[in-house]
From Swiss-Prot:
Keywords: Magnesium, Metal-binding, Thiamine biosynthesis, Transferase. Pathway: Cofactor biosynthesis; thiamine diphosphate biosynthesis; thiamine phosphate from 4-amino-2-methyl-5-diphosphomethylpyrimidine and 4-methyl-5-(2-phosphoethyl)-thiazole: step 1/1. It holds the Pfam family TMP-TENI. This is Thiamine-phosphate synthase.
Length: 211
């Protein structure tokens, strides 16, 4: 049963781009996307705070679900919609502070053991990856593939789930067919020849998410 220890999110979050700049956040919100993540890596809090503030303000303006990757203190300080954490960040993060601030929490997983760890934290949603080989980041684990993804989705039947990792426009329909509630994409949009067209096509496949 879906009983998160953090504020809930819609069962289907729809298309979920993960981007590294405020410029991309603004473009995608203007294009109709309503679930996004700002992921800026390996910088100090003071170096990213202005971007976090600007992204959160844009999210509010568009009534969108904006998650901040990793920088949970800034997300709390500026009241983001939510925070997304990798497995490696869970132990170093004050989950009680995130919960007390009323922020949603998403957690990355790569196998059954990590799903168990995520479930113990009772987050708002669980991300399942990486589905396919990806060039976006170095991954210590092997790609899950569609069959494994479907098995995880079945196990987490009443939990909001997000598939991530190597999901292209061509692969997106098969990913959605597993029953997963959302697809997170990076290069499928940011490296597309026509990002507006790619975004529109992905929205047709994955939707904007439930209200």
């Amino acid at each position: 049963m879906y009983q998160p220890d953090f504020p809930p999110v819609p069962f289907r979050l729809g298309l979920y781009p993960v981007v590294d700049s405020v410029q991309w956040i603004e473009r995608l919100l203007d294009a109709g996307v309503r679930t996004l993540q700002l992921r800026i890596k390996d910088r100090r809090d003071e170096e990213v705070e202005a971007d976090v503030v600007a992204a959160i303000a844009l999210g509010r303006r568009y009534n969108a679900r904006l998650f901040i990757n990793d920088y949970w203190r800034l997300a709390i300080k500026h009241q983001a919609y939510g925070v997304h954490l990798g497995q490696e960040d869970l132990q170093a993060t004050d989950l009680n502070a995130i919960r007390a601030a009323g922020l949603r929490l998403g957690v990355s997983t790569h196998d059954d053991m990590e799903i168990d760890v995520a479930l113990a934290a009772r987050p708002s949603y669980i991300a399942l990856g990486h589905v396919f080989p990806t060039q976006t980041k170095q991954m210590p684990s092997a790609p899950q593939g569609l069959e494994q993804l479907a098995r995880h989705v079945e196990r987490l039947a009443d939990y909001p789930t997000v598939a991530i990792g190597g999901i292209s426009l061509a692969r997106a329909p098969a990913v959605i067919a597993t029953g997963v509630g959302s697809i997170a994409v990076v290069s499928a949009i940011t490296q597309a020849a026509d990002w507006r067209l790619a975004t529109a096509q992905l929205l047709e496949i994955a939707g904007v998410g439930d209200e």
